[in-house]
């Protein structure tokens, strides 16, 4: 199990990303817009750099919903490999069966 502080930190990052998403998209659009003046583009770059680091979606980490494990997480289920295996063995995941050949 991940520490509570790590889970809370990730939740805080998700909220920060959601809060700044619209403004970041506008600034990025201004930066790549070739019709904008160089001064406007530079101002957009500076404004983007002044935003918090955690406002970037690249800083988010997929974590298991049950344990908070950061590695071995299946996106489709939102579970870590261990929890997914346990859920599959209990029959909690419809259509998922253990392979045998």
Swiss-Prot record:
Q: Name one GO molecular function term.
A: structural constituent of ribosome
Provide the GO biological process annotations: translation
| Keyword Chloroplast listed | no
**GO CC terms in record:** cytoplasm; small ribosomal subunit
Mind telling me which residue stretches traverse the membrane in this protein? none
Entry keywords, A to Z: Ribonucleoprotein, Ribosomal protein, RNA-binding, rRNA-binding
Pfam families xref list = Ribosomal_S14
Matches recorded under InterPro entries:
Ribosomal_uS14, Ribosomal_uS14_bac/plastid
Which proteins does it associate with, and in what oligomeric form?
A: Part of the 30S ribosomal subunit. Contacts proteins S3 and S10.
Q: Which family does it belong to?
A: Belongs to the universal ribosomal protein uS14 family.
Q: What does this protein do?
A: Binds 16S rRNA, required for the assembly of 30S particles and may also be responsible for determining the conformation of the 16S rRNA at the A site.
Q: What is this protein's name? A: Small ribosomal subunit protein uS14
Could you read off the lineage of the organism from its UniProt record?
A: Bacteria, Pseudomonadati, Pseudomonadota, Gammaproteobacteria, Pseudomonadales
